[in-house]
Amino acid sequence: KIAIGHSLRFWGAFYKSRQMIAEGAIGTPVFGQIHRMGPSEVLPASKASGEMSDHWRSDTRYSGGSIPEGFIHELDYSRSVFGEVVSVYCESTGRRVYGDHVSPPVVQAVIDYEGGETATLRMGGTVGYNWNGTTICGTTGSLSFTGWGGPVYLHRPDAAEPEEIGCDDTLAYALELRDLIKAMASGGDPENSGLNGKKNYGLCLAMYRSMEEGRRVDFTDGIPDGIAGDWQYTGPAEIE
């Protein structure tokens, strides 16, 4: 058996919200909105072109670039909630000059899933404002959280205020190892299987391809169509 540890399925708010969804807290999940929008500094017009970061994690030769480094955890989480991806459309904005300043880069994607569910995802910078947060909307209620560690908020139509629900203190790595051991004993597959990791990274590559070609990328059985297994994105380290 192989498990890919690059996942936060068992971490804090990700794990707790998945438990609540499985227990029917919001009915059937149908829509998600995920923001990884960190606070950006004021960018001078000189930043309109060229690399915006020289950190190795932004270099596609070493890490895959901005998309997997920015929110592969959230992409995996969305798949754990909604199921297999059937298509994705992605575009990037920013680095436009407005007088003496330039707008920060932002990646935006719309993902469709096998049951007809949809999620919108944004990653990038907002000047002076930390715009992080995840919302999962269902047929009878919604869940939201802003930090990986929780708490999770349950929103019901008959409640004036959301219910705050704390997250377990159980170490995520212990839960991940427990899941792997269970899979080994039962002959099944762990949640963070090698195939799951391949699908996560395939989604990242499909987002790059969508931006490059300006079109929606379709999937078959959770794998993007028309992208070779050994294809590597070699575009700008920072999204342009």
What do the predicted segments below correspond to?
Residues T118, S142, A160-E163, R216:
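Short, mixed charged/polar active-site loops
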Residues I4, A160-I165, A183-N200:
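Glycine- and charged-residue-rich phosphate/anionic-cofactor binding loop of Rossmann-like
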Residues K1-A3, L8-D100, G214:
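Predominantly a Rossmann-like dinucleotide-binding segment in NAD(P)-dependent oxidoreductases
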Residues R9, G128, K199:
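Glycine-/small-residue-rich active-site loops that bind phosphorylated ligands and cofactors
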Residues F31, E69-P151, A174-P190, C204-Y208, ...:
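Contiguous beta-strand/loop segments that form the cofactor/metal-binding neighborhood of enzyme cores
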Residues V42, L203-E213:
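Amphipathic C-terminal alpha-helical segment
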Residues L180, G197, G214:
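Hydrophobic, well-ordered secondary-structure elements that form the walls
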Residues Y62-P68, P162-L171:
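A short glycine-threonine-serine/GTX helix/turn-capping micro-motif
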